[in-house]
């Protein structure tokens, strides 16, 4: 039985891209190990962020609004930000990462990670690091933490 994520993906991913994305992911996985794939997707995310800069934001609320406007413009879900004291929690919902196939969920979220890192660096948070908090089970919700890098 299809999951909610499967249904949403089916509705929002053009059929012309499904086979290509899965074949691309399979070929990437055949040529690169998991860490290399994460590094590649992180760099792709950085490039995406550089090509789609955010406006200056003076608050967490303004940042969330800018991020959500950016993701909504390409139908890539939405984000929630929460100040947890020693880190900023970033939860991204509804990115079409499952389009690459279930096995790719181990490395495709690095695209989001690289995007968030680049945007936050551009806003002056270059002394902080975006890290992924676990591997998403279904790819619908991906959590990241923005915090000081640990040695």
List PLM regions with ranges.
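Long, amphipathic alpha-helical coupling/dimerization segments that relay conformational signals between
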Residues: 95-132
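Beta-rich nucleic-acid/ligand-interaction surfaces
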Residues: 129-148
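N-terminal accessory segment detector
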Residues: 1-89, 95-107, 139-141, 150-151
């Amino acid at each position: 039985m299809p999951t909610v994520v499967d249904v949403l993906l089916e509705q929002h991913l053009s059929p012309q891209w499904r086979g290509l994305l899965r074949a691309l992911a399979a070929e990437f996985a055949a040529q690169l190990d998991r860490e290399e794939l994460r590094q590649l997707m992180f760099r792709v995310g950085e490039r995406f962020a550089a090509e789609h800069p955010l406006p200056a934001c003076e608050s967490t609320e303004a940042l969330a609004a800018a991020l959500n406007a950016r993701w909504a413009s390409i139908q890539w879900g939405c984000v929630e930000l929460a100040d947890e004291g020693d880190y900023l929690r970033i939860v991204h919902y509804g990115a079409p990462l499952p389009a690459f196939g279930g096995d790719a969920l181990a490395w495709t979220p690095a695209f989001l990670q690289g995007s968030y890192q680049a945007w936050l660096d551009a806003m002056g948070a270059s002394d902080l690091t975006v890290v992924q908090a676990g591997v998403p089970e279904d790819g619908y919700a991906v959590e990241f933490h923005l915090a000081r890098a640990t040695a």
